[in-house]
Amino acid sequence: MNQNKNYRVLFSNLYKDTQMQENAKMSEHINFRVGGPVDILLTPNTKEQIVETINICKENKIPFYVLGNGSNVLVKDSGIRGVVIKLSEFDNIVRDGNTIKAESGALLKDVSAEALKASLTGFEFACGIPGSVGGAVFMNAGAYDGEISFVIKEAEVMSEDGKIITLSKDQLELGYRTSAIMKKNYIVITATFCFESGEKDKIEGRVSELTNKREEKQPLEFPSAGSTFKRPEGHFAGKLIQDAGLKDFTLGGAAVSGKHCGFIINKSNATAKDILDLIEYIQKEVKKQFGVDLYPEVRIIGED
């Protein structure tokens, strides 16, 4: 009996066959459209399933990775050994007055749309971010002068010892692309956001403005993980990369976007190695020319 058969048996009481996919191509589950297979991909749709899955993995010493929308992840070409828990089906959104509670697999654009529907302001910045709620809280995602820390009230998380706890905004320790969740290896279950009442036409106008700006300035026509690098203090990664003469620079099937140099794109059937090699090349050139270290914002996972 091979390891994958063991996985199927192990999770068969918890999942329907349609929720288990063996040797799933990760290139079909991340926005970069690269990456080798995972032994088994599970798609839970309840909190109980998520908790029990993680407990089974820990009890059996099976490596696991929790994936939201796959928008800020790069999976290596050799794939992932163990289990990927994809939360795309765990995506309920419930509004109560000025608060919205969303499960971690819910898309930010859907939360933004729910806020707009109720004339709630504060989440316009997230209307075009392609990520999920869990991933956004994990890294304190932001865009256009807004970020998760401005609107979050609390998050329900699973701690490393398997307990479900609720963390207040302060306890989340949200900073630039970081959080207590990231530092302590917690898993986001739900997040609750608190908004101000606003004027629907103004909110709609801002959403439309940001959508147009994103379409004009970002290479949305190519697979990517958004901004590849974190913003270095006192600089902008995209400008450093452009000033280093790397606009449109290509390595294999990966390229620096000519539209926005902060984006690496999968231009022509790139491999994960193409993208990783390009990341490394950019880091070396920017360091050599400007003495500035660039650190990836995209999460890199998988086997070498």
From Swiss-Prot:
It is an enzyme of class 1 (oxidoreductase). GO terms for biological process: cell division; cell wall organization; peptidoglycan biosynthetic process; regulation of cell shape. The keyword Cytoplasm applies. Pathway: Cell wall biogenesis; peptidoglycan biosynthesis. It catalyses: UDP-N-acetyl-alpha-D-muramate + NADP(+) = UDP-N-acetyl-3-O-(1-carboxyvinyl)-alpha-D-glucosamine + NADPH + H(+). Residues 33-198 form the FAD-binding PCMH-type domain. Its main location: cytoplasm. PROSITE patterns: FAD_PCMH. It is found in: Cytoplasm. GO terms for molecular function: FAD binding; UDP-N-acetylmuramate dehydrogenase activity. Its EC number is 1.3.1.98. Keywords: Cell cycle, Cell division, Cell shape, Cell wall biogenesis/degradation, Cytoplasm, FAD, Flavoprotein, NADP, Oxidoreductase, Peptidoglycan synthesis. InterPro entries: FAD-bd_PCMH, FAD-bd_PCMH-like_sf, FAD-bd_PCMH_sub1, FAD-bd_PCMH_sub2, MurB, MurB_C, MurB_C_sf, Oxid_FAD_bind_N. GO terms for cellular component: cytosol. The active site is at R177, S227 (proton donor), E297. Its cofactor is FAD. Pfam families: FAD_binding_4 (PF01565), MurB_C (PF02873). Cell wall formation. Belongs to the MurB family. HAMAP family: MurB (MF_00037). This is UDP-N-acetylenolpyruvoylglucosamine reductase.
